[in-house]
Amino acid sequence: MKTWWVAVFCICSPALAQPMAGGVCFPVSQRTGEVGCWIIAHEPVGQLARAQTYWHLDAYPTRDAATSAKGPRGTVVEALGKVWLLSIEDEGWRPSVKGERVAEIGPLPVSAGEQYKAQYMEVVFKPGMTSSTHRHGGPEAWYTLAGETCLETPDGTLIGRAGGQDVIVPGGPPMHLTATGTEQRRALVLILHESAKPASSLAHDWKPKGLCKNL
């Protein structure tokens, strides 16, 4: 499957919400409504031995069922109306207790031998909402259930849609996101960042041209 190197339109920190046009990322414990960017988990995954890894998404009928299937690099969350087991593992991995296999997203480029953390978010954005210009401390990927997003980077633009190719962005490059189309965007998002680096940070060294506004 072809992979689009794209990113989510949210700057998130586990301890401090970051301001942006259209909203901020908050811990899910502070949730007051549906729309927004909500940090649902932020956990260490340990040292990654290889230069690439994969994000595995499995759904289960109950939290207990998902927990029974969880491996050492798995996280159980409730988001977007389902119970999820989200795992960082090699290509082709499957949990010990079978659930509904939803997606296997990757490869995610990482630095072999480095320690990593996984930050997971539930994102619900209305068309027209945008991000601040930002970058990540490791690869980012998302699983989109609905909606459309336009990414602008120094290299141009890309469009990510529900039902399309896997969307991933490597750590480092600056980016600016706009929720486009007519449908509310609903997605699960992963930032797999080096433990010594922040998940996200503002990027002041590049200014977007607004290429997504005309789409």
Stretches found by the model and what they are:
Residues 2-8:
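Sec-dependent signal peptide recognition
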Residues 8-17:
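Hydrophobic h-region of N-terminal signal peptides that target proteins for export
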Residues 22-24, 30-31, 42, 137-156:
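Glycine- and acidic-residue-biased ligand/ion/polar-headgroup-sensing regions
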Residues 23-97:
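N-terminal accessory interaction module
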Residues 28-32, 53-67, 113-115, 125, ...:
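Short acidic-glycine-tyrosine-enriched beta hairpin
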Residues 38-41, 118-136, 157-162, 166-174, ...:
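Conserved short histidine dyad/triad with adjacent acidic residue
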Residues 71-72, 78-83, 150, 171-198:
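Ligand-binding loop in jelly-roll beta-barrel domains
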Residues 79-84, 88-129, 187:
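Flexible, surface-exposed loop/linker segments and immediately adjacent secondary-structure boundaries
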